[in-house]
Amino acid sequence: MFAKLETYPAALLELVATANDAAKAIPPLFPLSSSVAVNPFLGQTEEPLAVTAARLARVGGTKIMPERAHWAAKLEAGDITETDLTEALAALKGRFNCPSLDDVKAALTVPSPTPQALPTVAELAADVSGLDWPALIEDRISAWAAGHFDEGQALWQQAKTGGTFSAWRDFAARDLTPEIQGLSGFCAFVAATNRSHWRAIGRASERLNLGTEAASTAFHRWLMTLGGWAQYGRYLLWQDELNGAQNSTVTELLAIRMVFDEALFALYEDQISARWAEVVAAHQTPVTPTPDLVIDAIWQDAAERAEQRRLAETLQSGAVQPVEGRAEVQAAFCIDVRSEVFRRALEAQDRQIETLGFAGFFGLASAHKAAGSDVVETRGPVLLQAGVSSQAKEAEELDLDRRYSARAKRAWGRFKLAAVSSFAFVEASGPLYAGELIRDSLLLGGKTKAEPAPALDPSISLATRIQMAKTVLTAMSLTSDFAKLVVLAGHGADVTNSPHESALQCGACGGHAGDVNARLLAALLNDRDVQKGLRDQGIEIPSDTVFLPALHHTTTDEVTLYEQDLSSYALQISEATRGKLKGWLTEAGRLARAERAQRLPRASSEASVHMRARDWAETRPEWGLAGCRAFVAAPRARTSGADLGGQAFLHNYVWQRDEGFGVLELILTAPVVVASWISLQYYGSTVAPAQFGGGNKLLHNVVGGIGVLEGNTGAPRAGLPWQSVHDGDKVQHDPLRLSVVIEAPREAMSEILSRHPGVRALFDNGWLHLIAMDDEGKLAWRYRGDLKWSRFDAPQSTPSALAAE
């Protein structure tokens, strides 16, 4: 990503730094095989919503807050009160020129203005020529990029030596399409560019009269026109930065885009130079929100405060006493909001059932190889590097069978895509799929054989395993009072014929199901040598406690128990409890499906919920995390009696057991951040689907194994498809920024935020809300930013409510 600084003049070095900053303003697009939720505002977390709204209006013509009719409806329904509005208005004072309360309310009668991005040279040239130059540029870059970035879908791979810009330069110098469309001499123009993409950026900037101040948002603007290609380049940069390496793909793509505009400027300079000078002058001005954007930000904050009031009431009415004595079953689920519905249903089966919430990778981020495969899957959060390696091993004969089957499947896939056979494939082979289609539609298919148990490979020392087990149990607030049976339930989704399948899997497991992580941890905790080591460190696991790995299928609310992983002794001592558990899980699944069916279109029966997982044409097999709005880290007793509607991330946390607040620090810096990415992806895909959404599933075509096109051309679409947030009648996700509720001392949270400026920025700039719960389970304190707090129930305009830490 970084240039060799000693080889460039000072003026170019300033542009290099600006280009690198622009690259980081773009969110990453993870490939379909390991797709995870990404915060579309990742590069803007250092500024508040209103400023980001102004920035994205300038560089993308993007509106990132709901229409005012949305808030007007909430106000009329009583969901937003005048108190909410007054507090939101008071909270914004000092940052911007704030309007009066009357002005804020009056604004609802007028639609907010539609933002217009500053035009590129290509758009100005299109205006004077009548030729759609932006579309041509998108088409030619996409035609090249689809092959250049291909991850195995294409039969013929492009050469990738020399870097992204160099590869495009070789392609474009021979691509006659722009010249045929009227961009005369373009091939020669490209051939004359320097092979250094930094030199190309420098030359184009000079030719277009771009100084450093104007380049900041101008570079961002050009990258926005590249859509998913720039975002995939940002993913490559993200991955290399995790490994301490460098990557210049995004800035090389910027150079490619600028070369097009440089060539167009040379062709149309006489007609557009005056207008382009105005654009450059506009890029030089500071990014400042308009009064309309400030008003919209106030309404957004008011809606979130209203939701926090309702959350406080729900939690107060739902608090229950914890299980007395030893629980018969403890079931640990991922904090994913989909688990909340099932946990509530399971706890309703018997008072001796206790559920826990923890990040779905269960503290073991693993670089994993499935049985019969050499492909390494990162089964952990994208924020972390894998801490261990694992592999699912089986007998050599079975391993070879899997490999031969996989090769045959790949060969069949290549036959489908080959230049000649692809034309006749549907007519010749379509009938072969009829049986499979009928079988799946009637739910007659057999269950997929479970993977063999994963094991750490290479193995690690006993001392390391003991420390790992202690760390995980401490983070789960599970260091005493173990039940007879402790279920460790990862989660995964069962969907058919969906390019976005990995987006419904466990985000904490890198877009994979959580079965591997659950099975690894269960094996670790069932190890008698590990238990002895834990006992020496003060964690006593009873001799009759068994850890049972499981997988919660979120599409069907069924649970797979990996009993085959247990020893004969563990099977024997847990037989009676496992028998009860299976009955409880069956009934809990029935209740959970009935609750979820109320939101799902055409889900009138329990069978129809199952059918969605196997239906090849189903665009909404489940709602995923649509509706997520809160994150609660507290003892389960604070939430177990509350119906949170499958809209809250629930993390077990007992601060009194957290010596030094290391677990609290982990929660704030890892699962809270991951949850914010999820929440803001749903937010962005709902309020700005054209920019941050994945488009219409019915029009999707996979490109390069990276992402999807909407149609057969253009750039990959990032974010969630429209069907993932909209039921055909109304949106299923209320665009609210996440409210994080933690039962812990404010001083400890402030101290942690002071050590992590990136996390603090999320709260200081309002991308997340932070609320402290007191020891009675009440929402007591609200984080105000700048390490200051105010009482949750106090009007925000009351100075005496402030408490600096």
Curated annotation (Swiss-Prot):
Pfam family membership, one: DabA
Subcellular locations according to the entry: Cell inner membrane
GO CC annotation terms, alphabetical: plasma membrane
Tagged with keyword Zinc: yes
UniProt KW Cell membrane keyword: yes
UniProt cofactor(s): Zn(2+)
Molecular functions per Gene Ontology: zinc ion binding
Major location category of this protein: membrane
Cited InterPro entries: DabA
Membrane topology per record: Peripheral membrane protein
Sorted UniProt keywords: Cell inner membrane, Cell membrane, Membrane, Metal-binding, Transport, Zinc
Ligand binding (Zn(2+)): 334, 336, 491, 506
Function field: Part of an energy-coupled inorganic carbon pump.
Family: Belongs to the inorganic carbon transporter (TC 9.A.2) DabA family.
Quaternary context: Forms a complex with DabB.
Protein name according to UniProt: Probable inorganic carbon transporter subunit DabA
Lineage: Bacteria, Pseudomonadati, Pseudomonadota, Alphaproteobacteria, Rhodobacterales
Gene assigned in the entry: dabA
